[in-house]
Amino acid sequence: EAPVTFTVEKGSDEKNLALSIKYNKEGDSMAEVELK
C-alpha cells in the first residue's frame, strides 16, 4: 500500500492559508505543515 497524501488549499480575503497533511502508513506517522 502506498502512502496517502492529502493537500488542502484555502484562500482568504485577508491572508492565504495552505494546509498540507502527509500521512505515511509505513512509519505510521502524521506530519502537518502550515504555511501562510
UniProtKB/Swiss-Prot annotation:
Cellular component GO terms held in the UniProt record: extracellular region
Disulfide partners: none
Keywords: Allergen, Secreted
Keyword Chaperone: no
Main location as per UniProt: secreted
NADP as UniProt keyword: no
Subcellular location(s) of the protein: Secreted
Similarity comment: family membership: Belongs to the expansin family. Expansin B subfamily.
Protein name per Swiss-Prot or TrEMBL: Pollen allergen Dac g 2
Natural source organism: Dactylis glomerata
